[in-house]
Structure formats: structure tokens, C-alpha cells
């Protein structure tokens, strides 16, 4: 919290949202690179690992990697003249002064808006808040005070990469709606050179070895790997680069392909999952078929897991490159198929996220079918009263429902259940049982947006359900709206109920601000009410920190508790008796409360059946898993399927709205195209060898193979996902997967075992 959560030194009262996580990351990387026992300590006020699966990362750092976490603000740093070491002085939880000596001190520096950026916003007549972030409404998070100008990323408020990427897509969605009528009028066609005919040519392989900064180069002897590659058969050019994925290096690769007449290209770097497509496009720009490309993953499969043995990592990198060279020599061009796109979207889930996604698509001119399993739209928002900023959720929800149901491009199906799903990107078919009569309907659509939402955890602990004086924060909000706070003299709130535990290790993100919102509401209408908030870490990230500060000013008492020694709750005639340990007094406190409010976490809706029908990956907690946490935060691994809102992970209403618009924006990139390209990596059947044994039919996770009228297996390449299960299972070797043919796989195996057998 250097430069954040500090109104005394720098005036930045907000939390910068990213500092805890990058301190965690850097400490773990430091321990990996130290090649020995390195003591890493993180001094903190609160650990704010509130993102999706961030808490698991924190637990790994603390419990497995041995990073120490000290809850304290450092008072003084003094240098030891003789050694240059640094002495840190701080007060521990009991108030006692402590000292520790370190070789290095790293400051987790926060984020702030540059003066030039603030000046630009003012020239554009865009309103800023007191910290120079763009003012926005919780229900229109990427809109600014000036119509037609949108905001995203840190300019809107402190946030990390996934939220910034999603907000960028959300802003693009709203801008796209304004420009919908002009779609397609300003497209510049990318000219791709005539493909080079490589049939009959001997392989001429180029190998580009990447340092990936220090991720690879800090462990592997990259120049040695490059020199080794030059000795391999058919390799005519080698090079090493700091970052092979950079635009400069892409241009160099193009130059070298032409200069050395390369007809196969290998990049030895990171994961093909994130970078393969980019390198393939580089080949296409030179006229080379994109499937004449091979990638050796010498980072994830090598330097990261052998970081303590550089010599072995270097040898393994050579092995991986040798294997890739052997496979590259067997590659041949493959050709992709074009398919038309059904210009309709299916949105599953009629909560705030689902409705905003539907509007984001419909306002750009695309028909939308919105499916909701309940009778009423709104989802969890039907149980919410107001945001922490004071915005009325109920009136917003009514307006949103009215807008959706009245939209000419949106068809709403309530009380509907999905029972079947088939197809591929741009051409899906979903079977739905609609209404009380459960009549069957088939919907053809080009994309899917998942917005199935989440629900409040129903506590099993702290006497919830056994004593009427124990409620959740959602129930308390409703009570305050209906009855006010007149009868409340003392209230206790317990945080992290149903979150950050064995069953649900993640932070539910909303609980701290929900507690503070209700506490401020009570204090506003009943200032003399005593309020105790028992917490593990207060996670009012970003601009929410101001509300935490205000709650303290209003006299709300915050007491930290250890999860190993949680509060205990008993019913009594006078109310609810809560016992907890106060770390400052180092003794147990007993508080008799009129009401106990549990900050219950957020749990995913039951998504198991839907995930099974649509064939989608989920986290252990039941949330849908995105394709890439940072680069593709709303895309699913299945192309044409997108996720948003609390179906993705717990989040605030404003964040769900941003992510819904982002999913709509990403879906538009499919719907706006006249046709889509199918991957050439599909399974092919040799009918002469097929024994009609049905093993491929039974083993395919997507139910693609079928036995045709000739009695042999047939695989529709448009439906094939290229997973290769059928090719691996076929006992007659009648099925082969393009780009993973037997000769290509076996060439790698032979190269690996070279000199061994």
C-alpha cells in the first residue's frame, strides 16, 4: 500500500487493487529464481486477493512456497552502514514494536492518473472524481458524463488486467451500438499473398528461440539452444530473440522467411495455447500455409519447472527443439473451410448480466433469444436494494426489464429449460423446453452468451436458520429498506461466511462492501447504534476504500479474527451473544447484539447439467472457466461461446454489467462476419480400414462420429473439435487427425529417443 490507502502522504485514499497480487507474484518468482532458501516477507494492511482464483494463489504462496505475511504498516526503514542491509521497524497486532533486517525492500507502488491524462479528460469535458478517475454510474460503468465518449481500464478506476480487458470490450460494444448502421462501410480488405506451393520441395526450416525476457533466458542458455538447432537436419536458419511475440520480431520472421526461402518455421518459446495463432498469421502474411508451423514450448514445459537446474533445462530445451524439427519436416499444407454464420445470438440467463448482454447485441442490430428458467427476469438482483453508492437497484431493474421485453430484436423465453445443444461456432442449435407446458423448441443461433448467475450462500453456521436474529447481508438490506434501523442498538457482522474455506477457497468479492454499505445505512439513520464488523481482511478494493474510511469515521468498529479461532455465537434472552478475540487487547470480548448479520458468500448456480449439455469447463466451485484469465476473460474455450456476470465468478453489479457488454462485444466479432473459418485440425476416416466397431462413436466427447449408410464411420469436419480422442481410440487405425498424423507424432518420439535406442 505505498501510494495507496494513504491520505496523509500522497492523498490517494483509494486501493490500487493490483498491488497485493503483484507482490505475491514477484515474491514467488524471487523464490524460484533464488535457487536456494530465500526469505520473502510481505508487510500488509489487508491481503486483497479478491479476483477469480486469486485466493488460491495466495494460499499457495503462504502454505506451499513459504512466503511470510505480516499484518502491519512499516514505521521506519533504517540502513545498516556496514552491510547496506535495511532494518524495518513496525508494530505488531498487539502494538509491540518489532524489528527485522532484510537485504532488499520492494515497495508495492500503487496506481494514479497522470496529470496529462486528467487534462485531456477536462478538455473533452469529461467529469473526473477527486482522484482524477473518470466519474461513472454503477449501472453504466463505461459511460462518461459526455454522450459518445466511453471509458475503460484504470482511467475508470484502479483495476487489474482481466477487468481492464473486459471493460475495453464493453466500451467497444457501446461504441459499436452507436455506429451499427455504418457497420461494414469502412472495412479495408487485408491482402494475403498467393500461397507458396511447397509440394515437392525439401524442407527448409527456420528456428527462432525466444528468451521470453527472463522467463526462459534466465534459466536456459538460449544462444546454446540456437547454435544446437543450426546443426539439425533441414535447418537453414536460426535466431534468438528477447520477445519473439513482439511486433518487431514478427517483422524479422517475415523478412527471414523470404530471405532464406523458409518453408517450415519453428518458434521455441511459450505456450501455443496463447501465441500459436499469432505466429500462424505471420506465416500467412508471407504466403506460407499456416500449418507449416511448429511450436516448442520451452517455457511452461521446461524453464518454469526446471528453474533450479539450468543445465538440465538447457539440455531439455535442445531435446524439445530437436523433436519439433523432426515433426516440422513431416508437415504438409492443410486447407481450412469457410462456413456461413447464423446472425442470431442465444443468451442463457435473464439476470442483470444476461439482459445487458442481450441489449448489447440487440442494439447493434442482431436478433437475440433470451432464455430464463424462472418466471421473472432479474435473477439475484430481485433481492438487492441499493448499491454502496446509493443507486436504487429496484428501479434500475424495472427499467432494464422493460427495455429488454420491449426491444424488437429480443425474444424472451421465461420458465424455459435447455435440454439439447449441438453445432459449432456460427452454427449452433439449442433444444429448449418452454413455458409451463414444456413444449419443445429448437433455436438456431451463431453464438452463445452464458449468464446463469449465482446465488447467496445459505449459511449452516452461526445459528443461521435457528435464530431469527441471525440474518444474511442481503436479508438485512431488505429489512433496513422495509423497517429501518430504529430497533437496532447493537449489531455484529461476521465476514467470510461460506467463503475462503475448504469448500469454497475463493473470496466472494462482494461481502466486505455489502457489510459496509449496511453499516453506513444504519449509522446514517441511527447514529448511536454500535456496529462491530468481525473480519479476516477488509477487501474494499479500488474506489470502495473511501466507504471503508467513512465507516471508521462514523464509529463502526472493525475487529480482525483468525480463521483458526473464529467467533462463536450463542442465543440468549437478550439477543445474540458473540464471542471473539481482540488482538489489540489480547483477550476475548463478548458482545450482546440485537442482530447478527452474516456476510454470506456467493455460490454459482447449479451449472453441472448445463455444462454437460453444452460441453463446457468449470472451476471446482462451479463457475464457468474462461479461455484465458487475462487475454480472453469472457471467451470460453469453445469458440462462439462467451461467459459473463457471476456465472464467471463473484462480482459487483457494475462489474457484471461491464462483463455482459464485453461478452456481447466479443460475440459481435462472430456475428458481424459473413462467414467463419473452421480449423483444418479435424479427424479423417479411411473408410477402407473402418471395421464399424463404434468405438469412435462411443468415445467422442462431442458425439460427432456416426455410422453412415455405407456402414462405416463418418466425421463431419464442421462439427469436429480436433481433440483426437477418436484417432487415439480407433483399434484399426482407420482415423487420423490432421496436423497430428502418426508419422508426425512418431517423428517426435524418434527424435526424443535418438541415441537412446
Please give the residue ranges for each predicted region.
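Residues forming the flavin
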Residues: 1-757
